[in-house]
């Protein structure tokens, strides 16, 4: 008689396909077959168990295929000292359910070691017939039932689950979440706003296993954009030219060129320009040298050995992202208006409309939306209003004096947008000027936090 009960099938082993990114990532594959006793088995090839370093996380992509003519229940179990396994909310398939003949399930799992020494995690597949009742988990094995949300999902859920208040600015009605100081802009991005939101996060750490104010920098979360967290450094890295080329070095005039794709500040912040004798990738590689500052190719000494990107771990957290370079020729605009212009096609003759890279600057709209629009009803050039400056958390970061923004002026070849020391936003500064630089970047979409509440005394801590 064929057995109609749950069968615990052997241990699933993980194949060692490692993908560089926020986590070490593995692909896992198993095929379900049926033996002569009507048991369902999992066939594994090229496998090893997963060793997780102390206080670290690995992401596992688990593939399960049923090649038997039948439907079976499935679940995923795990064991290991100080090991916790959770499933991601953006997993392709659920962590438990049924799998049809010829079909596969793709489950995204987080394997975390909370101990102070490395530990080995063992994953196992638990199977049963479709009508065979609940899955029975053997002794020493834990069924994966907890979910792990990326930080972007966590913040999005904070906003979605909160009570909203309508705020009208420039005839646009925004939905504000006063409890968490979150709002949704005209592009459906979720942003932090106000005087002092809880958007602090440790980043650029020398030791991610022991994150603190002595091992990490404090950055701020601008918001969630296309499923990715956007950060800004909590203070400037110094004052440098946005670009200071002259006619002899490639500009249309001697005041610099407002093309971010070739800007000297871009080459200072990003990788790939190490061969440049001045400024090339110095911030990205935490090195010292000379940087461009002042008119007509002028330079000054610069040192990023303590303020630059510290290590490969941090560099692997940074996502390549499209930054928009649409311009505008009037600073009498509201946040919703300049947001659309940034993503538009109005540029100075021949300038590109977007750039893909790792590190850039804040948009004018980032600065504009950081203000509490329920209190600050001005257009951007009037953000020097004391009510606006006192209710905009980004003011002290971007412009304790003058601070550069990313967006070019579309009508002139050598002007870009910037924040004046008083808090107003303008576009009429020559790019050769040396203004404050607050780096902006996006984390990889699967970035998670292991602890923290986002307050200044308890910043979020990234799980790596």
Regions found by a protein language model. Name each.
Residues 40, 78-87, 91:
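Short, solvent-exposed loop/linker segments at beta-strand-coil boundaries, enriched for Pro/Gly
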Residues 47, 51-57, 101-104:
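Solvent-exposed, conformationally flexible loop/turn segments
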Residues 54-68, 107-110:
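Short beta-strand elements of extracellular/lumenal beta-sandwich folds
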């Amino acid at each position: 008689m064929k057995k109609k009960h749950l069968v615990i099938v052997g241990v699933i082993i993980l194949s060692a396909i490692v993908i560089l990114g926020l986590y070490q990532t593995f692909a896992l594959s198993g095929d379900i077959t049926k033996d002569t006793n009507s048991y369902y088995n999992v066939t594994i090839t090229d496998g090893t168990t997963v060793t997780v370093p102390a206080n670290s996380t690995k992401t596992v992509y688990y593939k399960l295929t049923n090649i038997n003519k039948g439907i079976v229940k499935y679940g995923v179990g795990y064991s290991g000292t100080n090991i916790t396994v959770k499933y991601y909310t953006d997993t392709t398939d659920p962590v438990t359910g049924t799998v049809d003949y010829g079909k596969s399930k793709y489950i995204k799992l987080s394997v975390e070691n909370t101990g102070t020494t490395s530990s080995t995690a063992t994953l196992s597949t638990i199977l049963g017939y479709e009508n065979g009742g609940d899955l029975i988990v053997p002794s020493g094995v834990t069924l994966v039932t907890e979910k792990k949300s990326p930080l972007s999902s966590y913040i999005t859920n904070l906003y979605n689950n909160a009570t909203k208040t309508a705020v009208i600015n420039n005839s646009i009605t925004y939905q504000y979440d006063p409890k968490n100081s979150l709002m949704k802009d005209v592009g459906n991005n979720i942003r932090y706003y106000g005087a002092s939101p809880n958007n602090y996060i440790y980043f650029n750490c020398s030791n991610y296993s022991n994150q603190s104010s002595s091992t990490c920098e404090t950055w701020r979360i601008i918001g969630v954009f296309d499923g990715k967290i956007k950060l800004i450094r909590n203070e400037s890295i110094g004052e440098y030219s946005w670009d200071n080329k002259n006619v002899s070095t490639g500009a249309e005039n001697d005041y610099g060129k407002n093309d971010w794709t070739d800007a000297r500040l871009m080459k200072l912040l990003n990788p790939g320009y190490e061969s440049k004798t001045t400024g090339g990738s110095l911030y990205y590689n935490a090195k010292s040298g000379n940087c461009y500052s002042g008119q007509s190719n002028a330079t000054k000494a610069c040192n990023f050995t303590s303020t630059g990107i510290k290590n490969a771990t941090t560099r692997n957290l940074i996502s390549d992202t499209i930054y928009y370079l649409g311009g505008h020729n009037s600073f009498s605009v509201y946040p919703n208006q300049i947001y659309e212009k940034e993503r538009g096609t109005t540029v100075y003759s021949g300038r590109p409309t977007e750039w893909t890279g790792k590190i850039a600057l804040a948009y004018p709209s980032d600065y504009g939306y950081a203000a509490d629009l329920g209190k600050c009803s001005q257009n951007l050039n009037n953000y020097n209003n004391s009510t606006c400056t006192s209710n905009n958390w980004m003011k002290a970061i971007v412009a304790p004096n003058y601070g550069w923004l990313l967006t070019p002026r579309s009508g002139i070849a050598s002007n870009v947008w910037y924040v004046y020391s008083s808090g107003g936003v303008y576009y009429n500064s020559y790019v050769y000027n040396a203004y404050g630089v607050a780096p902006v970047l996006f984390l990889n979409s699967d970035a998670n936090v292991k602890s923290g509440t986002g307050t200044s005394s308890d910043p979020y801590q990234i799980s790596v």
